[in-house]
Amino acid sequence: MISKINGKLFADMIIQGAQNLSNNADLVDSLNVYPVPDGDTGTNMNLTITSGREEVENNLSQNIGELGKTFSKGLLMGARGNSGVILSQLFRGFCKNIEEEKEISVQQFAESFQAGVETAYKAVMKPVEGTILTVAKDAAKAAMDYVDQAEDCVDLMAHLIEAASESLDNTPNLLAVLKEVGVVDSGGKGLLCVYEGFLKGLKGEKIEAQAPKLDTESFVNDDHDFHGVINTEDIVYGYCTEMMVRFGKNKKAFDEQEFRNDMSEFGDSLLVINDDEIVKVHVHTEHPGDVFNYGQKYGELIKLKVENMREQHREVIRKEQDGLQNKEANESKTVETAIVTISVGDGIAELFKSMGATHIISGGQTMNPSTEDIVKVIEQSQCKRAIILPNNKNIMMASEQAASIVEAETVVIPTKSIPQGISALFQYDLESSLEDNKRHMSDALETVQSGSITFAVRDTKIDGIEIKKDEFMGLAEDKIVTSDVNQFHAVKGLLSKLLNEDSEILTMISGEDADNSITNQIINWIESEYPDVEVEQHEGGQPIYQYFFAVE
């Protein structure tokens, strides 16, 4: 029987909870409702709790109150994305409730979960039911209702997990979009993984780290690991080569071991996956053509890809140098008022700088900066005042959390997109007070409509729109309004929703994957269909999104 939890046992719970979430992060990511490339709930929650776990492992204590403070601090500073911030707030309240204790009883254990829920709900401006908040609330209520019957902390935790699981299964009944897509809430699932790990820790059991599953669809990560490679010329095999071969009836019989042996002669980093009808191959080689010719001995080539890794390495070096320069600029720049913008893409960063941004933090949809990232920039600027432009709804809560931590008087302008950030920054007045700037910059968001074009990462149906993986989607604000296999048609569908007879200016920001011919086609179409609209086009260089649009 475990009637008390001390610091050591709580540390074991945290470590197992973090490990269980880490093992299931991909599963949690897969529950994301929208088919938009995303920072992803599982990834953000995993990074958040890993920060808390590392802080705990470096500052172990028998005193649960002291350990709780350490855990809470790690979560707070490492919080990424809205799901990560909510997770940090749940355990901020939990740990606040035990901060004076050396060990806690079953009753205090239950009360701490309830305290966490109350703290998290207060931190969210407009709580939505059917999310991680609901799962946490229902689980905590069940624990409080059961505490008098619980044999010990293990029994209470098991009961809490049962209630959390039931609540998670009910989330589609509370949130229509979950029911439409046929999934449970991703944040709630992530929290359940943490709770299940807690129970393992309480029982003295260990969850082993699981190797990440190989994605046979994308096959390999396009981001090659160049660590340790100093000179581009040191790369022996310069072409990352992939192929899929469908076996032919009248072709050479496939012997996997022979195939592997022969393929290994072409280079290194060989991966071969055989699923009876198709063989998938990844190899680094100097002669991609020879690889393809060899593959044709066995059947038809149905998918080919070649990437020049030497060119990629040159690009990595360039970006690292640019990043170092930006880091040094951020660290060395001291200002009276810091204007901190979260931005992705070299062109967008330069645009923000030209408009008066003093500090740029690299981040966006698939790379949410942590609370600590934002805090560090503000503190290193030694400013008296700060304005944060999150430019993404999933970075909003981390920005607000950072604003509450720093000593400088800091406000957050609720910009949910890059176009909104640009419109807000246009209204910044060096001579105005912080409150006046906050009001004027926030008011500017009412005058701009934002849109974007990106690709779908999964098949789904949202708001009656059938979406297929790899189609181009048009988003007006956060709502998917069109999806088409043809990029230009997707853009037309989106702009037809954004533009009207009152529209005056269209700002178009092209991403790194934007096609110049399509960009020109878009401009010509706008000039023809909306002759009174002035078009301003910028090279943003952002990944994931081929285009950002702002209509005023």
Curated annotation (Swiss-Prot):
It comes from the Bacteria. PROSITE patterns: DHAL. GO terms for molecular function: glycerone kinase activity. Residues 8-200 form the DhaL domain. GO terms for biological process: glycerol metabolic process. This is Uncharacterized protein SE_0901. It comes from Staphylococcus epidermidis (strain ATCC 12228 / FDA PCI 1200).
